[in-house]
Amino acid sequence: MNVDVLLKNVWLYQTVTQTFVQRNVAIKNDKFYYIYEEENVNLQPQKTINAENQWMIPGLIDAHMHIESSMTTPTIFSKAVVRYGVTTVIADAHEMANVFGLEGLKAFMAAETELDIFHAIPSSVPSTTPELETTGGIIGLAEVAELLKEPKVICLGEAMNFKGISYEPDSLIRQIIDLCQKQRPTMPLEGHCPKIEDQELADFLYSGITSDHTHQFPKTLKEKIEAGVFIQFQNKSITPENIQVIVDNDFYNYASIITDDVMADDLLKGHLNENVKKAVHAGLPIEKAIYMATYTPAKRMGLHDRGEIAPGKKADFLLLNDLESFDINTVYKSGKVVFEKGEPFHYPEKIEEFPATYQQTIQCKKLTEEDLLLKVATTKETVRCNVIQKQEIGTFTERITKEIPVENGLLQWQKANCALLIVMERYGKNGNISFSLMDQPLSEKGAIATTWAHDHHNLMVMGNTIEDILLAQNELLAMQGGYLVASDQQVMATCPLPIGGILSQAPIEQLGASLQKVRQAMQALGYQNMNEIMSFSTLSLPVSPAIKVTDFGMMDTKSQRFYPLVFPEDGVLLHENTH
């Protein structure tokens, strides 16, 4: 029998036993053909590899991620991640959908890539409703019906609107879930349910959703798995405490390791492989970590042709020089080498072509000093204000109350150690501008501005001086989107994202370096978080606990109630553009 490749005496990861055994592995065309121990087998390989000192594992599968989080396009992303052993991803391109709708999704899906990209239907575009946030695109029933016909669509993307899912039978998200269940009854329905437990969890799961990838904690982690939830561990959930729950309860079949979001600068260092290593360091046996990054995600997504090394399965695999350090020597996709250690990153020969209109999409007005004068009608010298307080770990926020002086009819927010947070509708639909306050997010004078503001991607700017806020907003508008940091009336760092204000086609090293400079500039201003970019960009995400901001205002993300900036009993904010 003629075969293409024969790997001899390799230490093979045997999925069924979750152990390593020494075997010979034959590959024919793009699939595994024969796996055997004995030497008297009549095979004629075109290429023989002596791999007796290497470890062979299936290609890594990322079952929940967003390519847009890396701020790059599918072809560039593909080139970047195959070197980390990732051979299959399930992408939820809801950032692209929020900006460009179905047209943008199809542009993403048409990309030709080295790794296999399957797609989730963005279920929550917008993440709440058009009455709570303004987006460029909307994915409704008609769009979902069209996407259900696509062969690369294999699941419903994370359903995020807790209130609509649990308590509003006629909501759009419930209608989308019903449509998917009718037309594709075996298709996985992905969920987003942070800080939900007890009967509220049951209400959420009753809709048919069966997974969660949000920030996990030991108590609710066990409760969710016992309730039938498939858990997807992103980086911040990979803790010794959470891993102990998995190990103690033998929950390996009910969880996988994912990335969710990997920033462009972090992509220079790794991808799913880094989370696998982190899980091992947190106490997960390496054999179980491999299982949860290959087999369980494949099984979850119905990808029965991959996820293990066995006859007839797709020949996606890695050769490791060392198991403990997860040192990748070679990556194979469909039986072909796509990466060898020491090989530099090559920019793709062919990348996506987007219409010119995708690069002129930010339609905000330029802010002026007059726009930032917060006038208050009150008889009091101080007024109570609702203020957002961020955390230094994770993306959750809280609402606190602060007494803020009023002088000559103007709110003196700077004297209360606050920063002004502004969200501006950027699609030319309604011109909304909302104003909120944050409690001491910066220790130095400056401002941060971005259009990479989850999930609606309106223009968001936050700062503690009027001059820096104006500079940051005006320059970001001229740049047509991205990230920008200003201090002392100078631009300190920029990361241009000209495609819809969320993506760049620059080489990944250049893009990553630009974002790293933005991150360092944010740190220099004293913005503290374990992931500064994601922390800032989710201040606008109205499905992330507990208080976030859209172009309509400051919102309690669970009740979907808006809070006024000034307590009504104390005064009224007189600003014509304030919602």
UniProtKB/Swiss-Prot annotation:
Family to which this protein belongs: Belongs to the metallo-dependent hydrolases superfamily. Adenine deaminase family.
Gene Ontology BP term (one): adenine catabolic process
UniProt cofactor(s): Mn(2+)
Chemical reaction(s) catalysed: adenine + H2O + H(+) = hypoxanthine + NH4(+)
Protein name: Adenine deaminase
Organism: Enterococcus faecalis (strain ATCC 700802 / V583)
KW Hydrolase (keyword) present: yes
The entry's keywords: Hydrolase, Manganese
InterPro entries, per database record: Adenine_deam (IPR006679), Adenine_deam_C (IPR026912), Amidohydro-rel (IPR006680), Metal-dep_hydrolase_composite (IPR011059), Metal_Hydrolase (IPR032466)
EC number: 3.5.4.2
HAMAP family tied to this protein: Adenine_deamin
Superkingdom of origin: Bacteria
GO molecular function, one term: adenine deaminase activity
Enzyme class: hydrolase
